[in-house]
Amino acid sequence: LRSRGLGDVYKRQHIVTTGFDRSNLYFEVRTAKDKMAQVMRLLQEHEGESGIIYCITRKLVEEVYEALKARGIAVTKYHAGLSDEERRMNQDDFIYDRCSLMVATNAFGMGIDKPDVRFVIHYNMPKNMESYYQEAGRAGRDGEPSSCILLYSGQDVRTNQFFIENNRENEELSETELEEVIAKDRERLKKMTYYCYTKDCLREYMLGYFGEPAKGYCGNCSNCLQNYEEVDVSKYARIMLCCIEECRERYGVTTILETLHGSRSEKVLRYRLNENCLLYTSPSPRDRS
């Protein structure tokens, strides 16, 4: 047989490019004060199904794992602080359905091909969209409908900021190069945070981040399925600014709001804002009582 040169191979090769859009995945962001309560609700919705909960630190993995275990849930855990043997055993328990739920840091998932993961919960917001897409994308690899839920709180931003600002241990980079890396990480964190606040289609935001076009309404994310009422607050903003200016910027936001609402609070009366501020709204007879 005559051996073919590399040129022949290159001529015959086909490059297959797949997009970022996976229409079977439902995306949702929930702003949560009590994240464990949200997790329990989600687990009830996905009872008997396989899922992953991603946490930002090993400590949180342990806390969430213990809380779920105490509630009688078949759960296992994975992070870099465990021994190789324990990580392998826990990974196998999840893959072979001996435990339906995995609580893990981002150390879990590389090279794992479990097609029937029905939900991925992010207990914390990741540091960038790349990490979120990769981790959320471990749901629904069999093409069946699956959910990707992000539980957001402001503390997530501060935690990620701390990690970014303290990531200065790379001796191969100069100080200038290190600052450039950190600046890019800050920008990526900002884009990730915007994802948690946008009222637009979450899928459109994600695809736009990765440079892919989207139609603007996917019908399979929390924003597209939520009815939002747009309210013009410019009038109220102007009134508030006028009140601040009239008070010569002497008082905090609470006192300004109390003045605009006609409150007879201790500060309003002490500063005689009820008498001297033109924007003070007199309370109704019912309010006085």
What are these regions (language model features)?
Residues 4, 8-176:
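Helicase motor core with emphasis on the C-terminal RecA-like subdomain
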Residues 73, 94-99, 112-116, 121-279:
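C-terminal helicase lobe
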Residues 12-13, 126, 250, 283-285:
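Proline-rich low-complexity regions
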Residues 1-10, 280-289:
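Single conserved hydrophobic/aromatic residue that forms the stacking wall/gate
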